[in-house]
Every structure is written in structure tokens, then in C-alpha cells.
Regions:
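C-terminal helix/juxtamembrane-tail motif
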Residues: 329-355
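Hydrophobic, well-ordered secondary-structure elements that form the walls
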Residues: 256, 293, 311
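Leucine-rich repeat
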Residues: 1-184, 188-190, 207, ...
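Concave beta-strand-loop units of leucine-rich repeat
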Residues: 50-53, 87-92, 115-120, 140-145, ...
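C-terminal capping segment of individual leucine-rich repeats
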Residues: 106-107, 131, 153, 178, ...
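Extended repeat-based solenoid scaffolds, especially LRR ectodomains
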Residues: 215-265
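Loop-centered beta-sheet repeat module
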Residues: 192-225
């Protein structure tokens, strides 16, 4: 393509080309012609990640200085709305300029904000982040959240992804309950709280992995996909009655993935675990829309088998249940137990995976 043709491309074509480039490549298009010189400065989506940098020969101090200069340069020359801002790098720790950048973004109706600090201590999010009322997607890695007392929630937020984060129990509960449009929630390797009370009327997807004591749902009737990974079996307080209470509040669940530590009752609770028949008779309970189930790390103890039996006998739409034991010990007996359970769905398939 000749230079004149490049210069005369329609605006929407130029925008499409720029949207496919990294911010580094987009800035370089300024040399193509005068019409392209600052065209990149109108990009609504700004992504600063490893693809934008080439700092392999620099020491950490020089890398940080270069990072700050790049982001400052782009934000200074940028002209127009900023809908998405992503900052992800292994050397972001100790860069106080992040506060200043977030303050700048809070004045530009930011809709999608992603901050991933791969090393170092938790980065305390500045109070100005909590004034970003146009946020639709928020993703934080290795951060500390302490909202100001004036924070009333993110009224437009639909997706929240928190990994390696620290926040207090009341902060978590207030955050979730004050995001009325929240549809997707991901929590991984968090600390500061161990009890999760999820109040989210529009929540459809929930993925959790970490160390916690209990999960309960309140007004979360739209939830369809649930994935639970408990990383420390000593923290599990689950028994059949708790699990029943858990699923009674999820009438529209369609897909479930669960790590078996969540199913293991403490020894003193084993005797209190009710039978599936009693639970069904007492509660008239059914998972009418459950289609896919995956249970990992089971060992064949009574709470696990009760739970599997309950799902199989009360899920008329179930298509597939995948079960993976924690070890080879007792695998054949476990398989025989699984095949003995009655299934409410004639099409339900049980898939046994080797450990």
C-alpha cells in the first residue's frame, strides 16, 4: 500500500487498524503521515503490558523510570475518552505514580480498569478509584482495598475479578452488595476475611479459590455457573445440611465445579450428616437446571458420597458428572458406589477420571 493510500484511508478503517496494535506500535504510526501523527492519541483502550515494553537489558530502577515515562507520555498526549486502561508488569511495585494515573482516569469516565502488580507487597488502591462510577469491569491483582467511608458502591459494575487481594470482611460484603448490576465475580487467593455472604441479584458466574470457612448466598437467584476451590481442607466446615442450604438459594444453577475439600465434614460432624433421603423429604429440593458437574479430589467418604447422590437423584436435566479421586486408593469401590446411585436424568453420564 502506497503512502497516499495510507493517508486517505477512511477514519473507521484507521481506527480498526489502531485497535489491533499494541500501544507501542500504535504510537509508531505517527511517522506514516501528518494525518496519522496523533491519531493514536484518540484510542479509547490503553493497554500497558509486557507486549509494550522491551526492557530486558535494563536494571529494575531504569525499567521503572522507563515505564513511568511511557505511561505519562501517552496520558499527556491522549485526547478523548478512555474506556479501558490495563497496567500489567512484573516491576510495578513501588511506583507511586500509579495513584496519579488512577486519579487521571477517574476524571475520564473509565469503564474497564485492570491493574496487575506481579511482585512485591499489596498495592493500596487510592480512594479516587472508588469514585469511578462508570466502571463496568474491575480487575485487580496483588492489591489492598480500603474504600473511603463515603463509598456507596459501583452502580454500573458488571464484572469483578480480585486475585491476591486483601480486604476486610465488612469491606467485601459492602462491596458486593453495593454493586447491583454485578454479573461475574472471581475471587482467588484472598485474605482479610473467611466468611463469604454473597448478595448479588444479577450474579450469573461465580469462581472462587482460596482459604475460607463458609459461603452463603442471599438474593443470588440468577447464578448459573459456580466453581469452588478450597485450598486448605482444615478450613472446611461443610456438611450435607450446609451444602443443601447453599444450593437452595441457587435454583438456576446450570454448571458446578467443586474441589472436594469443600465437601469434607470435620470428624465431630460426621455423625450429624443426614442421609439423602431425609434431606429430600424434609426440603422437597431439586436442581432442575443443573446440567454439568465436575468434582475433583474426592476420597469416597460419606459427606462426599451423600452430596453426589443428592445431585444425581435431584437433577433431572443433568447431562454429565465428572468425578476425579484424590488418589488410586479405593478407586474401584468408589466407582461401584457412583454407579449404584439412582439418577433423575436418564441421559446423565458419569465420567470417572484417573487421579
Amino acid at each position: 500500500m502506497e503512502l497516499d493510500e495510507i493517508s486517505n484511508l477512511p477514519g473507521h478503517v484507521v481506527d480498526q487498524i489502531l485497535s489491533q496494535l499494541s500501544i507501542r506500535e500504535a504510537v509508531r504510526t505517527s511517522v506514516l503521515s501528518s494525518k496519522w501523527r496523533y491519531k493514536w492519541a484518540t484510542l479509547p483502550n490503553l493497554v500497558f503490558d509486557n507486549e509494550c515494553y522491551s526492557f530486558s537489558s535494563l536494571d529494575q530502577t531504569a525499567v521503572k523510570s522507563k515505564l513511568v515515562n511511557i505511561v505519562d507520555h501517552v496520558l499527556l498526549l491522549h485526547n478523548g475518552p478512555i474506556y479501558k486502561f490495563k497496567l500489567s508488569h512484573r516491576d510495578l511495585q513501588g511506583i507511586s505514580d500509579i495513584d496519579r494515573w488512577i486519579l487521571h482516569l477517574s476524571r475520564h469516565s473509565i469503564q474497564e480498569f485492570i491493574l496487575e502488580i506481579w511482585k512485591g507487597q499489596r498495592y493500596k488502591m487510592p480512594s479516587c478509584l472508588f469514585s469511578c462510577q462508570h466502571l463496568i469491569h474491575l480487575e485487580l491483582f496483588n492489591c489492598l482495598l480500603k474504600p473511603p467511608s463515603t463509598f456507596k458502591g459501583f452502580k454500573s459494575l458488571k464484572s469483578l475479578d480480585l486475585q491476591h487481594v486483601t480486604l476486610a470482611q465488612h469491606v467485601f460484603e459492602n462491596l458486593i452488595s453495593s454493586c447491583p448490576l454485578l454479573e461475574r465475580l472471581t475471587l482467588m487467593n484472598f485474605d482479610g476475611f473467611t466468611y463469604l455472604n454473597i448478595e448479588a441479584p444479577n450474579l450469573q458466574f461465580f469462581d472462587i479459590g482460596g482459604v475460607f470457612n463458609d459461603i452463603s448466598f442471599e438474593n443470588a437467584f440468577q447464578l448459573a455457573v459456580v466453581s469452588i476451590g478450597l485450598y486448605d481442607k482444615r478450613q472446611s466446615h461443610a456438611n450435607s445440611s450446609n451444602l443443601l442450604k447453599f444450593f437452595v438459594h441457587l435454583p438456576h444453577i446450570r454448571r458446578l465445579e467443586i474441589q472436594s475439600y469443600f465437601l469434607k465434614a470435620r470428624p465431630e460432624e460426621q455423625a450429624a450428616v443426614g442421609t439423602v433421603t431425609n434431606i429430600k423429604e424434609d426440603n422437597n429440593w431439586s436442581c432442575h437446571q443443573l446440567r454439568l458437574v465436575k468434582i475433583l479430589g474426592i476420597s469416597g467418604i460419606k459427606p462426599e458420597l451423600n452430596f453426589i447422590n443428592l445431585l444425581l437423584s435431584t437433577s433431572p436435566a443433568l447431562e454429565k458428572m465428572t468425578v476425579k479421586p484424590a488418589s488410586n486408593n479405593g478407586g474401584w469401590e468408589l466407582l461401584k458406589d457412583l454407579l449404584r446411585f439412582r439418577r433423575a436424568s436418564v441421559q446423565a453420564e458419569i465420567i470417572y477420571m484417573d487421579p
